[in-house]
């Protein structure tokens, strides 16, 4: 049965959802369309029973953009799509983060969601359509799922909110935020803004949620028509006696540990010791009270001596203890108040050869951030279905295993690192100078050296400081903070600057960055249902206060951007030449421009309009390259004196001298010296440099060629001219 339904979200944004035609062997498949952009989402969940010791949900979300969707060919030798691009990874993360909390507890079957863009009108982005399609594919399947989820993008143009703005509308929008949610709550946020207020942010979320409710209702309607029975699954039931035994053995010890402020490593060591002891004590307890026959015949009894199950029960006690400590006593693991930011230390310029650097430490989270300034040639190429451009401002985030005291392999960058780097980049991008203000390509690299929560926000702070240290004229400094939430029933507590444990054991991770005047980026993930707008408003206001506190600490370290670039940063000089001179500067096969680069050490970039940018770390190299280019493009002027090179000698006629690049003139034998010259080779040698004066320019009526008459004698008689035409 093919079902096709359409919904109008207003403002001409019409979305259609179809199921039952494509990919019918998947557990669920849906095609979503807006304009001529179409995505197909499929979901398959294994029916194979998970291993007994598995304690996680193996959900894999993949998002792929086919070049054929936009009538394009992939690059490379094989001309086919390969590993996912950064855009595809970020889109997959948007979908994964919104869907994952909505699967029922205890559902541990391997599940794979694949979202493929099959048509692109290159105007409507497919990422939020992919989130809608993925949720609807699950809804029409037999996979257990709590509630439909929808994603929308919200923009604001001239003060009016727009749902799912296209790329042309986003150019004029002062915010770009992706919102994922169910009919009752918001579960995911991510976006960038041009310094909007907390109230405006809340209004944007409410506007987006109204559209989400409509899309969720449509999904429920489609699922009801498909009417596929939900497959049965039985989550592992933990025996009450095991739960109680573990609680009695560990609750007091874990509570004492929770109320003792400790560093991350000390807490981890002591917690691990408690886990080890309690697991052994629990197994000994049940082995002493039950027979071996009971363990082999009663699955519930077997769970009581399973180390993985016992470990999970200890974790539940630890989580409950920490949450009640925060809710009942307003006390945190490190002893801080709920809205208190950890101590901050800042060092600037600690990497001598970098073009700007900062070491930002907040508690036990530390980021070493450097900037590198380059030319257009250093821009990052971006090629996807909706755009092909060069990024001149980008941030790379690295999270090596040693920053959390672990070993691990170093290789390709993971999805988490790409996501964190993208958030930090979007946070700072809003205050970066325009190309007209600062023609450099800017690369920021954040290396996390220590991590105990909020390393992406440390990258925002460190990135801002490194830019200011490097003399990059940013509009305003930006800081970031990660907020957390503990919620039990009607009671809740919002936490500022969360630790890793508070993130892991809490209900929300809400990162907010911005200037003193407003928010520039945000990212939120929610693990619970029922987040109301009052809590969100509280979190935004508390984040604002924390952000301003951090900005105050940053401004103490560096009140304003340095007035000069770093010593080793390239110095850029621009010159504009006639377009018809570009070929002369490049030379045959790039020979001329390559020789200039080799001789001067300068990097040269030429635009199609004749703008030439020279980048060099020394003023000498810059001046030498500039002089060479001026000489290459100079027009011969009668009366100017040049330094030329003898190219050919005709003893009875004179000498041919190259006085400008690729431009020769004749020094007649009578113009070589004031004295009589009978043989030119007695006075000049091939390759010799001589000072000549251009005395006449004539066009040969027979050949049409321009002929230049030079004089060494006249140049010697004239005083040396210090002007731009003279080749010194």
From Swiss-Prot:
It is found in: Cytoplasm. Residues 639-713 form the S1 motif domain. Keywords: Cytoplasm, Magnesium, Metal-binding, Nucleotidyltransferase, RNA-binding, Transferase. It catalyses: RNA(n+1) + phosphate = RNA(n) + a ribonucleoside 5'-diphosphate. Its EC number is 2.7.7.8. The keyword Cell wall biogenesis/degradation does not apply. Its main location: cytoplasm. CDD domains: KH-I_PNPase, RNase_PH_PNPase_1, RNase_PH_PNPase_2. One of its GO terms (molecular function) is RNA binding. It holds the Pfam family PNPase. Mg(2+) binds at residues 503, 509. Gene3D superfamilies: GHMP Kinase, N-terminal domain (3.30.230.70), K Homology domain, type 1 (3.30.1370.10), Nucleic acid-binding proteins (2.40.50.140). Its cofactor is Mg(2+). InterPro entries: ExoRNase_PH_dom1, ExoRNase_PH_dom2, ExoRNase_PH_dom2_sf, KH_dom, KH_dom_type_1, KH_dom_type_1_sf, NA-bd_OB-fold, PNPase. One of its GO terms (cellular component) is cytosol. GO terms for biological process: mRNA catabolic process; RNA processing. SMART domains: KH, S1. Residues 570-629 form the KH domain. Disulfide bonds: none annotated. Involved in mRNA degradation. Catalyzes the phosphorolysis of single-stranded polyribonucleotides processively in the 3'- to 5'-direction. Belongs to the polyribonucleotide nucleotidyltransferase family. HAMAP family: PNPase. This is Polyribonucleotide nucleotidyltransferase.
